[in-house]
Design a protein with these regions (language model features):
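Alpha-helical membrane segments of multi-pass proteins
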Residues: 1-185
């Protein structure tokens, strides 16, 4: 995405670190968590590559259509898997947002808005609202619950890759990253 270099590199670092943690979560003994972690790792690394500042690297013209194909496939997979759990609907929205941003970058790789008008396009605004709500809800879910003193012992017995609060923090950071990327579209 085309924005200032320093925040762009911070976003790259955040998304790459999140993607790396999600790869480690793929070693979980829980199959559903492994699958979700794989989807989230793809999203984290994809966001990291897309967030590289344009001043540092200008990708060839074929990159954005390739992104659209990869994340279009991820969206179709999320749609198929959403039959078994509503969490995959968020993966569907995230993959669709990546397809949308890749399409915007394909049509105008050097400008933020390819739509010619002033203001925020309707789809961008809808995605911004969705991810803002997702970030707020995810942040609230990370707040400690009163009476959860016994959960500290349970958490120490779990493998660090299987801890749900770390997975929630991972999803929260990717939601924040998606918000930042959508603001530059």
């Amino acid at each position: 995405m085309h924005g200032p270099a320093s925040p762009g590199w911070l976003l790259v670092a955040l998304c790459a670190a999140t993607g790396a943690y999600c790869l480690l979560r793929m070693r979980s003994s829980d199959e559903t968590q492994r699958r979700a972690a794989g989807d989230e790792a793809l999203m984290g690394f994809g966001m990291a590559v897309m967030a590289v500042p344009g001043s540092a690297f200008t990708p060839p013209a074929w990159v954005w259509p390739a992104y659209a194909v990869v994340f279009g496939g991820a969206a179709l997979r999320a749609l198929w898997v959403a039959r078994s759990g509503t969490h995959h609907l968020h993966h569907l929205v995230g993959a669709a947002a990546m397809v949308y941003m890749a399409a915007v970058m394909t049509s105008s790789p050097t400008a933020g808005h390819a739509h010619g008008g002033s203001g925020v396009p309707l789809l961008t605004g809808g995605l911004l609202l969705y991810f803002a709500a997702y970030v707020l809800v995810s942040g609230v879910r990370l707040l400690p619950v009163a009476g959860a003193a016994g959960s500290a012992a349970t958490a120490s017995a779990q493998a660090w890759g299987d801890r749900p609060e770390l997975a929630r923090a991972c999803r929260l950071s990717m939601g924040i990253g998606m918000l930042a990327m959508l603001l530059t579209v």
